[in-house]
Amino acid sequence: MTMTPEQAAWFQGTFQRLVDNVDRAVQGKREIVSLVLASMLAEGHVLLEDAPGTGKTSLAKALAATVQGTSTRIQFTPDLLPSDVTGVTIYDQQQHRFEFHKGPIFASIVLADEINRASPKTQSALLEVMEESRVTVDGVTHETGRPFLVIATQNPIEQAGTYKLPEAQLDRFLIKTSIGYPDISVTESILAGASDRNPSAGLSAIITTSAVADMADLGASVHVEPAVLRYVAEIAEATREDSAIRLGVSVRGAIAMIRIAKVWAASQGRHFVLPDDIKALARPVWQHRLLLDAEAEFAGTSSDAVIARVLDAVAAPQARAAA
C-alpha cells in the first residue's frame, strides 16, 4: 500500500511537532534534529563526529522523552567488553535457573559515546545489534524493540588511544553528521537557562513508541519512481568510477539513501520522492561511505567535494508525482 496525500500531510505535521519538541532542549539545530529523527523513522543509526559539549547527550534524552521511550548512554573505553553492552546470563540461585540481564543496548535511544575508543571486538558486538535489532545469547534471541536508534559519537580532535572504525562498519550507519557549536544568539539563550541541568526533563511526550513504529511503517510506503531509483544507482556508480575514490558508495549505501529519502519526502508533506530529496541527503548519507585514494587526500580533496562533483555530473530526472 502506497502512502496517500492525506497520510503525507499527517506525517508532515507530526514530524514537525516532534522536531519542535526536541528543539526546545537542543536549540538552534533543527536541521540536525530533523536528520536524526528521519534516521530513526527510517530505522537506521547515526554517527555524530563532534567535540565534547555540543549537545549530543541532550539530543538523545530529548528524543527519547519526545517519543515516550527510554534512553541509555554507554561510555566506550578500551576495557569495555561486549557483554557490558549486550548483557550477560547470570544464575539465579533462588529460582535455580539462568536469567539474562539485559545490557544498556536495550533502549529506545542509545548514545554510544566515543565508539572509537572501544576494542574492535566490542565495536563489532554493537554494530551486530544495530544491524539485526536483536541479541542472541546461549541460543535465546532477545529483540531490542521499536524504535531502536543508536547515536554513536566520535571526537574528531583527540585520536590517541582510539580504534578507527573500518569502512565496512562505517557503512552500517545510515547517516554521519555533526551538531557543531551554536551561533552567538543561541549560545546566549542557552547560557540564560544554564541553571537547568537537564533540559529534556520538562519535555512532554508527543507520541508513543508504538506510534513511532507506525510512522516508520508509513514512511516506508512512500512512492519512488523508477527514474529516481535509476538516478540513485547512477550516482552510486559515478562515485565508484571517480578517479579520487578508492571505495565508492556500495549497494547498501544506495539502499540506505532510498530508505531515508522516503521518510524525508514524507516529512515535507509528499507521498513521493523527488531528485531534490536525494541531493539534500547525499552528504550525510554518503560522505562516510567514500574512501579517498592517497593522492586525492594529499591534494586536500574531501568526500564532500567528490559528492558535489558527482551530483553536478549526473543528470537528475524529471520525476513525476505518484498518482
For each of these PLM feature ranges, what is it?
Residues 92-97, 118, 122, 130-222, ...:
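Canonical AAA+ ATPase core
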Residues 50, 113-114, 125:
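Walker B catalytic acidic pair
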Residues 8-51:
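Pre-Walker A (pre-P-loop) alpha-helix and adjacent loop at the N terminus of AAA/AAA+ ATPase modules
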